[in-house]
Amino acid sequence: MMLMSENDCRIYREELAPKLPPRIFDAHVHIMRKEYFPEGFTFPERNTFNKFGGEFPVELWRKLMAEILPEQELWLNCFSAPHLQVDNDRTPEVEGEKEFAMAMVSPADTVETLARRIEAAKAVGVKPYLNYAAHVYGKKENDVEVFDMLTPEQLEYLNEKALAVTLHIPRSGRFADPLNQKQMIALCEKYPNVKFIFAHIGRAYFMRNILESNIEEFAKYPNVYFDTAMINSVEIVKYTYDHFPLERVLFGTDTPIALLRGKSVEINNQYAYLMGENYAIGSAIIDTSGVVEFTTFFYEQLRAMIAATPEKDLEKVLFTNAYKLFTGIRNA
């Protein structure tokens, strides 16, 4: 499939290519094949994966990255789709030094199951998700707590092996939620060898959420990282740099969602995805009349990173920070 429009090509040529480093490390990618699901499984009509034929294999990721970033060498850290019907024993099949994978994990998994899954895939860590915890504990998804997402036994194993966790924090308050803040800090203190990567900068997609966060408290914990997946806001990225070490900020995109056409915007202390395509993601507002010519969320994220990051530090955030983290885990 071809993704780029003439407008995308112009954006890359005029805005991105002159400023991007030669290598980019995307720390937040979902890779999934149809065979990860039961036979006959189909996604709802407006699910993002349907844009790509009902799956997003790593071969397609490689092809599309060569199209949208033709002058860059792409590295990735990836995980499967957090879906209750997915086979969590299927971790993305990555190859070579530039590709890393994490195993999906549910609180229902024994340590033995988790260890086997990680060792079989040579995974650098795990990706829990709130829907697994909700299912296991019989909670509504919005009632899930950070402590619900991994068991103490799983965390002890991850701490012993010094692996990483990419954690999408729960609850409607996101990074401003006092319980989230307390439990996130508690994990970092109790499991100092686990590299905690809080996805989407703690899901702080709008300014008030990060202003009411405790991001500065995490600066003293060397095992804490934040990824920037789906953050389109220059101001939020700048605020992060002002209150947390830039050397532990990881560029991430949330591909394949990031390959949809749209932009995340702040509206009245909330956020919404203005969309040029009719796919169901979060708080999407669809331009049904086709008035606006959108580029991809991927390019909007790169625009934000370039605008927010000092030129001398851009390569750190877009490549070096993730490179050091994930190669360090793999080579330990």
Please state what every model-predicted region is.
Residues 1-80:
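An N-terminally biased module of ancient metal coordination in phosphate/nucleic-acid-related enzymes
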Residues 2-13, 201-332:
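H/E-rich (His + Asp/Glu) clusters that bind or coordinate divalent metals
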Residues 3-8, 83-173, 220-224:
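Active-site gating/metal-coordination segments in enzymes
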Residues 20-23, 70-76, 96-101, 121-124, ...:
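Short, well-ordered coil/turn segments that N-cap beta-strands
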Residues 23-34, 165-169, 198-201:
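Histidine-centered catalytic micro-motifs
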Residues 25-27, 78-79, 102-104, 127, ...:
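Active-site neighborhood of phospho(di)ester-bond hydrolases with catalytic His/Asp-centered motifs
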Residues 30-35, 83-86, 108-110, 133-135, ...:
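Active-site environment of divalent metal-dependent phosphoester hydrolases
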Residues 87-92, 111-119, 174-190, 205-218, ...:
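Distinct, well-ordered alpha-helical segments
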